[in-house]
């Protein structure tokens, strides 16, 4: 299968760069699967998981807080405010943040925007999913 160059950059650092067979992400209009030869595209991506299949068929999962995905001939770039490798996610920290977000939603504070609380919970759920997928990939390697 043909490959293309992928670069994933957060506001702080380059997270990934290399030859890949495919990338999956959630775009503003739905799920995206990008393979070599994909038509040029520029789209927003939603907070969630970016799944990468490398040249050697190994897979890596990243969490992104949202951003943009650009497809050019043989080059794909993901620009995200926050991008974290699945192996760097801390399950305990995620679960604590998730519980706090759930508690805040239930408390219904008048001075806090409910939509912001739901967005925070959604991000924590996406991080948890990225963590779980990474754990599954690690177990399958053993």
Swiss-Prot record:
Flavoprotein as UniProt keyword: no
UniProt subcellular location: Cell inner membrane
Any one GO MF annotation of this record: proton-transporting ATP synthase activity, rotational mechanism
Keywords assigned by UniProt, alphabetized: ATP synthesis, Cell inner membrane, Cell membrane, CF(1), Hydrogen ion transport, Ion transport, Membrane, Transport
Lipid bilayer topology: Peripheral membrane protein
One Pfam family matching this protein: ATP-synt_DE_N
CDD domains to which the protein is assigned, alphabetical: F1-ATPase_delta (cd12152)
Gene Ontology CC annotations of this record: plasma membrane; proton-transporting ATP synthase complex
Domain of life: Bacteria
Principal subcellular localization: membrane
Family assignment from sequence similarity: Belongs to the ATPase epsilon chain family.
The protein's assembly and partners: F-type ATPases have 2 components, CF(1) - the catalytic core - and CF(0) - the membrane proton channel. CF(1) has five subunits: alpha(3), beta(3), gamma(1), delta(1), epsilon(1). CF(0) has three main subunits: a, b and c.
Function of the protein: Produces ATP from ADP in the presence of a proton gradient across the membrane.
NCBIfam families noted in UniProt: ATP_synt_epsi, PRK00571.1-4
Full protein name: ATP synthase epsilon chain
Native source organism of the sequence: Actinobacillus succinogenes (strain ATCC 55618 / DSM 22257 / CCUG 43843 / 130Z)
Taxonomy of the source species: Bacteria, Pseudomonadati, Pseudomonadota, Gammaproteobacteria, Pasteurellales
């Amino acid at each position: 299968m043909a490959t293309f160059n992928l670069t994933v950059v957060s506001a702080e650092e380059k997270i990934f760069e290399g030859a890949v067979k495919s990338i999956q992400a959630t775009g503003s209009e739905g799920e995206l699967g990008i393979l070599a030869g994909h038509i040029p595209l520029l789209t927003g991506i939603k907070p969630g998981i970016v799944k990468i299949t490398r040249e050697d068929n190994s897979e890596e999962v990243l969490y992104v807080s949202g951003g943009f995905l650009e497809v050019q001939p043989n080059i794909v770039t993901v620009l995200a405010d926050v991008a974290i490798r699945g192996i760097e996610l801390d399950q305990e920290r995620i679960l604590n943040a998730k519980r706090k977000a759930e508690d805040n939603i239930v408390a219904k504070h008048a001075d806090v925007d409910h939509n912001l609380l739901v967005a925070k919970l959604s991000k924590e759920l996406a991080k948890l999913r990225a963590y779980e997928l990474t754990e599954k990939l690690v177990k399958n390697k053993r």
